Amino acid sequence: MKYKDLRDFIAQLEQNGQLKRITREIDPYLEMTEISDRTLRAGGPALLFENPKGYSMPVLTNLFGTPDRVAMGMGQPNVGALRQVGTWLSYLKEPEPPRGLKELMEKLPIFKQVLNMPTKRLSSAPCQQLVLEGEAVDLDQIPIQHCWPGDVAPLVTWGLTITRGPYKKRQNLGIYRQQKIGKNKLIMRWLDHRGGAIDFREWQEAHPGERFPVVVALGADPATILGAVTPVPDSLSEYAFAGLLRGSRTEVVKALSCDLEVPASAEIVLEGYLEPGELAPEGPYGDHTGYYNEVDEFPVFTITHMTMRRDAIYHSTYTGRPPDEPAVLGVALNEVFVPLLQKQFPEIVDFYLPPEGCSYRMAVVTIKKRYPGHAKRVMLGVWSFLRQFMYTKFVIVCDDDINARDWKDVIWAITTRMDPARDTTLIEHTPIDYLDFASPVSGLGSKMGLDATNKWPGETNREWGQPIVQDEAVKQKVDSIWAELNILG
């Protein structure tokens, strides 16, 4: 289903019983986090806080608090259908002409969707109904959440950050958290490998000393938001992918202060710049790991223009020990990753990122094993194929008779098919998550691969065990009399 903007999505969620309006006064300082956290852990609805303490602007949280709501936002009927999104991405990553009429007909839906990828630029847009600039810019008008007791300041969490480097035509969209440090200043916390950081670095090389234009959109339509967190190919704009998801072209409008394009239906837009050399200490903040992160310096975003829709809604979230909203997104996006990986490694049967592993720090892969050493090839491939997995610390590879999503199955495979010395691969001095304080050096650590597959000749000299399997005829006979036996009542 198509959603023209965030408000349309909210209306559909409410109609489906997936949104709860809270009219009681709730404080953005800690209280919204506690209510949102309890709701998410119970699989509850999105929340619209209509009366934030001290503010007139409502706050939307838990928008993507269940995998099914993520699928809805991507225009799909359920989580399983997200595999189709992964199929689109795998084709866009490595497009191939159809080989014959049959393949042409199979790929026709993709070709039709591609027509929705170019953006549609408007001359005016709802996101610019109200305009504040210069001294009138005031972030204090926005009920920015202060999520955890140890957080240093309020934190913008769903800021859709729009940048363009000097060497690329396409714009980059990314979600980076932003600490509020003044009425017109935020800290732009992005890691070196993220698209926005790369654009800024290249800008400073090409235009030394010049200000770098940046726009942050809050409350865009769901397809645009989710497009920014999906592993789209580097050559493809997230706006284009959002059009593919939505089934209609993404409507944008030129920013007032620069040539960047912003989502036309966004609730709030912050325009401004990064001044080269202007840094500020960011953090500590409670993060998706379940811990407070270290303090480090990041660029300062100075806001020159703040535009809004009338009666704007502030879209927010919190991060903490899983499950949180990023973990839920990880569960849903897991389905998108499977076809991408299978295109490169057809032997992969399933791929699972357990949410308890902070969404990406551990992966379980099942394969149709073909030769000795196959599991090691796959684990090395996972670490290197997609940028999203460069921070995955543990990769467990099992045979296709194991359910990657069932820990009982996976643990059985590890304990019966692995020799710790032979089947463990350790790699040192690799890129690691900056937030991973367990690594010996910030941003640099090790990885472990576990080969929990059945071993082939060449991998072992011993006769390998045969799994116990009941006779199929006996199973069918017992099935036929099971209800009559009434053993379990």
Curated annotation (Swiss-Prot):
Q: Where does prenylated FMN bind?
A: I175, Y176, R177, R189, W190, L191, R194, G195
Q: Which InterPro entries match?
A: UbiD, UbiD-like_C, UbiD-like_N, UbiD_bacteria, UbiD_Rift_dom
Q: Which sites are catalytic?
A: D287 (proton donor)
Give the catalytic activity. Answer: a 4-hydroxy-3-(all-trans-polyprenyl)benzoate + H(+) = a 2-(all-trans-polyprenyl)phenol + CO2
As for subcellular location, the record says: Cell membrane
Q: Which GO terms describe its cellular component?
A: cytosol; plasma membrane
User: Which Enzyme Commission numbers does its entry carry?
Assistant: 4.1.1.98
One of the GO BP terms on file = ubiquinone biosynthetic process
Q: How does it assemble?
A: Homohexamer.
Q: What is this protein called?
A: 3-octaprenyl-4-hydroxybenzoate carboxy-lyase
